[in-house]
């Protein structure tokens, strides 16, 4: 037998769910790195967790390490030997090399060739050794390498960890790992585990992985988080069927309740229907954030959206048979929470949105207050309203009035009691307060949707009107933060400007709005007129970089379009997609090399040209028939008013044949300087015309 099953359990006090879930994804990679470091080839690594334990399971863990060879290369023989002659013995430099390796005289004078030079050399063979001696050092190094964000010390221990560690149980090949003193964390190891607290508090001896799993299963500990999740979902499904409800199984919440339970049970509780007068988002958020409850909805017809039901799902870790007692306890706690929410909500309704003291809240140090931000956003919103009035289906005067009002009250809910309690409800509460205070519905909805999209695949604002308010917020944040040097770098993006920029591009693309990243940014910067001066090209470049996340295609195609003067967001996307369609077309996919060979040569000829250089040429200086042929084909394209971008691209790429013929028979670098210049100018004109679509030299096929 060359391998056996290895199980390691690290017994801890309750681990914080979010910290555990974040680091759990990195654990297999970190463990593999430690094994590779010691040249250990292991089978599949499984890592299980409950709130009180981390368990590492490897089905095929080798009994012995591999025999390895470690090579050491020293100085060249010429400078390491007396009189530069290896028959004359080693000098101080040569002796020093071997002495550092702890070698004796009779082992001197091994040499090898490296980089065509003979150098001093030694190969150290590491014999096979039992892996049992490596397990504890690896486990301790693994624990030290885990990053949960925060750690603590307890007693007089040497090392810190996220929570106190009480035992490390190692089960491998019948070896005895008990009684090992772990000074770092202040305990001696036991070949034992602990079970569900309601089953007992004492250690239970285990002598094999099989016995370990049997003890946990018998004592209400489901070690595998996937099995705990499956149990929760199955019980929720049964409750849905029995009570004719729909349960919203929020992914993040599901992960969290799996992480805080060892033997989960899904139970249905109820709250007073009177609380349903609250906006549903308050109830759902209160249940999720404060109590880790799942919301339930009334089951209606497929045509109707489900409405919130006065129930909730609590996932209990108790193995108490009296489930009703658990439910009643949770109902009592939720009642108190929702009573608080009613109090906050009713207090907020008494305060007019107009009177929110925005001037008392600093936006960002150096960028004024929320009132200052609101005033800047208002100027941007007025500009965008005039620009997009044709998409708003209302008179300009009315649109300007409504947009101004929307921006004026958009931040008022930030000072509300509900948002103070649940910051994720910003905008949403503003919507409800606006409706209650008889604001225009478009205005109220735009307040709700101003922060959209919240993530890459999240919903967008539902109208152009809401989009104007959302874009105003995003543009002001970008201008403001860039103007004071708060520019994302590396992985640091404290104000989430990358996500915000992506959302800005996505909104504009979705509604097909005209927005030029050079002209409109400059116009807005000047129109607002209060931002600190900074290079707008930095912001332009930052936004252009986001296109690589926005469009799913060959990055070189995106780069080719961005390398032109095109800065209209929608047109950039249209050109990228049109180029992608052309290159993905089966009839073109087979001849990409042929299509691009002439264009690449055209690009190389013009690579050093000044973009502002003249492209004037005269057909009177054409001497070769192929010059005229290329000119006629090119001129036909220039004169054509193409119905679509696709047909224009098709026509331009159709120039590859006359271009190939041109390069075969025409010497661009003619001895006659005037003819040479004319030919170069002509080809420069052809190349510049391509730049109306993309820079062909950037496309990698």
UniProtKB/Swiss-Prot annotation:
<dbReference type="GO" id="GO:0004820">
    <property type="term" value="F:glycine-tRNA ligase activity"/>
</dbReference>
<dbReference type="Pfam" id="PF02092">
    <property type="entry name" value="tRNA_synt_2f"/>
</dbReference>
<keyword id="KW-0030">Aminoacyl-tRNA synthetase</keyword>
<keyword id="KW-0436">Ligase</keyword>
<dbReference type="InterPro" id="IPR006194">
    <property type="entry name" value="Gly-tRNA-synth_heterodimer"/>
</dbReference>
<dbReference type="GO" id="GO:0005524">
    <property type="term" value="F:ATP binding"/>
</dbReference>
<keyword id="KW-0067">ATP-binding</keyword>
<keyword id="KW-0963">Cytoplasm</keyword>
<keyword id="KW-0648">Protein biosynthesis</keyword>
<dbReference type="InterPro" id="IPR015944">
    <property type="entry name" value="Gly-tRNA-synth_bsu"/>
</dbReference>
<comment type="similarity">
    <text>Belongs to the class-II aminoacyl-tRNA synthetase family.</text>
</comment>
<dbReference type="GO" id="GO:0005829">
    <property type="term" value="C:cytosol"/>
</dbReference>
<dbReference type="GO" id="GO:0006426">
    <property type="term" value="P:glycyl-tRNA aminoacylation"/>
</dbReference>
<protein>
    <recommendedName>
        <fullName>Glycine--tRNA ligase beta subunit</fullName>
        <ecNumber>6.1.1.14</ecNumber>
    </recommendedName>
</protein>
<comment type="subunit">
    <text>Tetramer of two alpha and two beta subunits.</text>
</comment>
<keyword id="KW-0547">Nucleotide-binding</keyword>
């Amino acid at each position: 037998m060359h391998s056996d099953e290895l199980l390691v359990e690290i017994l801890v006090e309750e681990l914080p769910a979010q910290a555990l879930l974040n680091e759990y994804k990195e654990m297999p990679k970190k463990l593999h790195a430690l094994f590779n470091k010691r040249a250990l080839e292991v089978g599949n690594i499984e890592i299980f967790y409950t709130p009180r334990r981390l368990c590492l399971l490897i089905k095929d863990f080798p009994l012995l390490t591999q025999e390895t060879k470690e090579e050491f290369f020293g100085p060249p023989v010429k400078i390491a030997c007396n009189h530069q002659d290896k028959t004359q013995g080693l000098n101080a430099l040569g002796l020093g090399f071997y002495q550092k390796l702890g070698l004796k005289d009779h082992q001197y004078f091994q040499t090898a060739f490296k980089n065509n030079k003979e150098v001093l050399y030694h190969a150290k063979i590491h014999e096979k050794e039992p892996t049992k001696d490596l397990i504890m050092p690896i486990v301790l190094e693994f624990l030290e390498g885990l990053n949960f964000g925060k750690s603590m010390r307890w007693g007089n221990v040497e090392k810190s960890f996220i929570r106190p560690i009480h035992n490390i149980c190692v089960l491998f090949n019948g070896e005895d790992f008990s009684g090992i003193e772990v000074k770092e964390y202040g305990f001696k190891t036991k070949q034992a585990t602990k079970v569900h607290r309601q089953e007992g508090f004492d250690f239970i001896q285990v002598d094999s992985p099989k016995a370990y799993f049997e003890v946990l299963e018998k004592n209400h500990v489901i070690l595998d988080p996937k099995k705990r999740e499956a149990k929760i979902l199955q019980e929720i499904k049964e409750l849905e069927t029995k009570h004719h409800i729909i349960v919203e199984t929020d992914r993040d919440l599901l992960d969290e309740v799996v992480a805080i339970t060892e033997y989960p049970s899904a139970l249905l509780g109820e709250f007073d229907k009177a609380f349903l007068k609250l906006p549903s988002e308050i109830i759902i958020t209160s249940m999720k954030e404060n109590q880790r409850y799942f919301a339930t909805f009334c089951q209606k017809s497929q045509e109707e959206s489900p409405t919130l039901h006065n129930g909730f799902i609590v996932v209990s870790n108790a193995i108490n048979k009296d489930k009703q007692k658990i439910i009643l306890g949770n109902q009592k706690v939720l009642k108190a929470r929702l009573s608080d929410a009613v109090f906050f909500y009713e207090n907020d309704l008494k305060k007019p949105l107009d009177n929110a003291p925005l001037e008392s809240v600093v936006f960002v140090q150096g960028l004024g207050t929320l009132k200052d931000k609101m005033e800047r956003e208002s100027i941007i919103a007025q500009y965008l309203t005039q620009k997009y009035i044709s998409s708003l289906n209302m008179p300009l005067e009315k649109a300007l009035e409504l947009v101004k009002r929307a921006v004026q009250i958009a931040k008022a809910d930030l000072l509300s009691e509900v948002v103070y309690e649940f910051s994720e409800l910003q905008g949403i509460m503003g919507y409800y307060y606006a409706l209650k205070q008889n604001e225009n519905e478009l205005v109220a909805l735009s307040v709700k949707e101003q922060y959209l999209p919240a993530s890459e695949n999240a919903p967008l604002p539902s109208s152009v009107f809401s989009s104007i308010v959302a874009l105003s917020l995003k543009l002001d944040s970008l201008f403001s933060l860039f103007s004071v040097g708060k520019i994302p770098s590396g992985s640091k993006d404290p104000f989430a400007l990358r996500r915000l920029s992506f959302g800005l591009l996505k909104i504009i693309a979705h509604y097909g709005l005209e927005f030029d990243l050079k002209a409109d940014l400059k116009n807005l910067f000047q129109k607002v007129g209060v931002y600190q001066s900074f290079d707008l090209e930095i912001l332009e470049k930052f936004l252009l970089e986001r296109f690589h996340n926005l469009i799913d295609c060959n990055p070189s195609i995106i780069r080719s379009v961005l390398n032109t003067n095109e800065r209209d967001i929608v047109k950039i996307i249209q050109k990228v997609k049109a180029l992608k369609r052309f290159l993905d077309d089966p009839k073109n996919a087979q001849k990409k090399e042929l299509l691009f060979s002439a264009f690449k040569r055209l690009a190389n000829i013009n690579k050093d040209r000044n973009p502002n250089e003249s492209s004037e040429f005269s057909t009177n200086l054409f001497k070769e028939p192929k010059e005229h042929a290329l000119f006629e084909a090119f001129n036909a394209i220039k004169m054509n008013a193409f119905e679509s971008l696709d047909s224009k691209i098709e026509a331009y790429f159709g120039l590859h044949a006359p271009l190939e013929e041109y390069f075969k028979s025409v010497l661009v670098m003619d001895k006659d300087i005037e003819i040479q210049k004319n030919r170069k100018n002509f080809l420069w004109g052809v190349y510049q015309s391509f730049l109306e679509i993309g820079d062909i030299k950037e496309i990698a096929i």
